[in-house]
Amino acid sequence: MWSGRKLGSSGGWFLRVLGPGGCNTKAARPLISSAVYVKNQLSGTLQIKPGVFNEYRTIWFKSYRTIFSCLNRIKSFRYPWARLYSTSQTTVDSGEVKTFLALAHKWWDEQGVYAPLHSMNDLRVPFIRDNLLKTIPNHQPGKPLLGMKILDVGCGGGLLTEPLGRLGASVIGIDPVDENIKTAQCHKSFDPVLDKRIEYRVCSLEEIVEETAETFDAVVASEVVEHVIDLETFLQCCCQVLKPGGSLFITTINKTQLSYALGIVFSEQIASIVPKGTHTWEKFVSPETLESILESNGLSVQTVVGMLYNPFSGYWHWSENTSLNYAAYAVKSRVQEHPASAEFVLKGETEELQANACTNPAVHEKLKK
């Protein structure tokens, strides 16, 4: 491994670097400065002169132990910036997380890779606002969503979270990418009003399901479901954190040949509208599949409408065609009162007849029969 040469200054630096990790470099230094290596010309193996062996025998043993200890530490070493991703985050794809981690500092560049999302706010913010206003009997002008509690799942840098907060809502934005949340927190700090209305957390949806069950008036998952690895679990969690009668808003990409051609081949590989690897066609979901899963979890789909993006103008507009992007709005069913059992109803009718029997002879005769 060492080609019969002395472990010189570079080797000493290597051991010194490993020193803070707990390796005993003091035991290795005598070997570096005094041990003599002789290369066997026939076998190419390493040998030590007999006179030197006795003198440095103890040093050799200590040094080998030191080196092996250091190598074991190297095997288990993890750079401090290499984030560990919990396996309990069942819907979070670690590959997707790494993709967005590399772009975390670009969220608020309106001319950068997230320009389409900035432009999408022209559609999705009114879409959310107008549908929520249908559930609010009286709203305050200028702050129409005042009093509403909204969860923005996969909030990224807060591009949609902030407009919802400006409409008066109390918004919690969650994202599994720590750098995304740092960017979002930094940006909202420039607006004291938003700083009070918006809260950001580094977590997945599954991690807050129990503590936030039936807490939110609305859940928003915009451009998120095409990145999760377990769609059914994700949507089930969305339903669980909604109040009865709460609203769920989703924008995503349909799973069609057209979406593959334009959403991946053109947008990523040709025009570079979004970075390569941002989307995986297999994760795209059709409106029919989405509606089926939502209805199985007690949500009723109210609206599905297509969205089209013009890469030349940079604007979005609504469309009847849902072959590419689309928005969906669903409402969680309200808790229904359980109907009284037949036994309970019969018992009530009997007690009523007995009470009337005291004053009505006809009823008394009826009970005898």
Swiss-Prot record:
GO terms for biological process: glycerol metabolic process; methylation; ubiquinone biosynthetic process. Keywords: Acetylation, Membrane, Methyltransferase, Mitochondrion, Mitochondrion inner membrane, S-adenosyl-L-methionine, Transferase, Transit peptide, Ubiquinone biosynthesis. The keyword Electron transport does not apply. Residues 1-85 form a transit peptide. The keyword Mitochondrion applies. Mg(2+) binds at E223, E226, H227. S-adenosyl-L-methionine binds at R124, G154, D175, S222. Pathway: Cofactor biosynthesis; ubiquinone biosynthesis. Its EC number is 2.1.1.64, 2.1.1.-, 2.1.1.114. HAMAP family: UbiG. O-methyltransferase required for two non-consecutive steps during ubiquinone biosynthesis. Catalyzes the 2 O-methylation of 3,4-dihydroxy-5-(all-trans-decaprenyl)benzoic acid into 4-hydroxy-3-methoxy-5-(all-trans-decaprenyl)benzoic acid. Also catalyzes the last step of ubiquinone biosynthesis by mediating methylation of 3-demethylubiquinone into ubiquinone. Also able to mediate the methylation of 3-demethylubiquinol-10 into ubiquinol-10. Belongs to the class I-like SAM-binding methyltransferase superfamily. UbiG/COQ3 family. Component of a multi-subunit COQ enzyme complex, composed of at least COQ3, COQ4, COQ5, COQ6, COQ7 and COQ9. This is Ubiquinone biosynthesis O-methyltransferase, mitochondrial. It comes from Homo sapiens (Human). The gene is COQ3.
